């Protein structure tokens, strides 16, 4: 097991990606995959609100729903570290505060949990100020809905800017 730097999240070194759960891998098969992963010590699952929206008849969120039903049926939420992402869902893109908060609530419902361990900005949104985006995350952390945040598909300069802003503003 390893600890994610700057956190108390202790995770298996292999994170299980779930972008096909609820799509190419139906729910029952996805549950079997997660059971096998868990039986080998796995505890870290990555998903996103937009996963499976590219499949006809899907709207996104299917992967989160499958993970939520699995955790509920196994009673293992406290043993798992769940990472999910916001900003690339077609029907609600971006990193505005309103979108982040709404997307978080929907992800919590689909995941059948009251907190997200690691909440990613799935891609940058330079049309929204860092103050607004990071302020929304700070609110969710203060409310206990999110434990830690992360960024995916950001330039190194934008990551540096985000870190500096957070440090300067005690976020």
Q: Where in the sequence are the language-model features?
A:
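N-terminal binding-site loop/beta-alpha segment at the start of enzyme catalytic domains
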Residues: 1-80, 142
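A cross-family glycoside hydrolase active-site/sugar-binding cleft signature
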Residues: 15-19, 48, 83-85, 119-122, ...
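A short, structured active-site edge motif that brings together acidic residues
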Residues: 78-90
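Glycine/proline-rich, positively charged
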Residues: 88-171
């Amino acid at each position: 097991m390893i600890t994610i730097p700057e956190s108390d999240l202790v995770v298996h070194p292999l994170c299980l990606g779930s972008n096909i759960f609820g799509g190419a891998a139906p729910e029952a098969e996805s549950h079997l995959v997660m059971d096998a992963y868990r039986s080998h010590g796995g505890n870290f699952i990555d998903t996103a609100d937009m996963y499976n929206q590219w499949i006809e008849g899907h709207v996104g969120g299917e992967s989160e729903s499958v993970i939520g039903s699995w955790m509920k049926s196994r009673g293992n939420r406290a043993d798992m570290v769940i990472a999910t992402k916001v900003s690339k869902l077609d029907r609600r893109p971006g990193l505005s505060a309103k979108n982040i908060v709404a997307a978080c609530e929907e992800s919590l419902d689909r995941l059948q949990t009251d907190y997200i361990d690691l909440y990613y900005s799935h891609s940058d949104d330079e049309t929204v100020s860092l103050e607004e985006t990071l302020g929304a995350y700070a609110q969710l952390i203060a409310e206990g809905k999110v434990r830690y945040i992360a960024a995916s598909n950001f330039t190194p300069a934008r990551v540096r800017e985000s870190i500096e802003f957070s440090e300067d503003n005690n976020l």
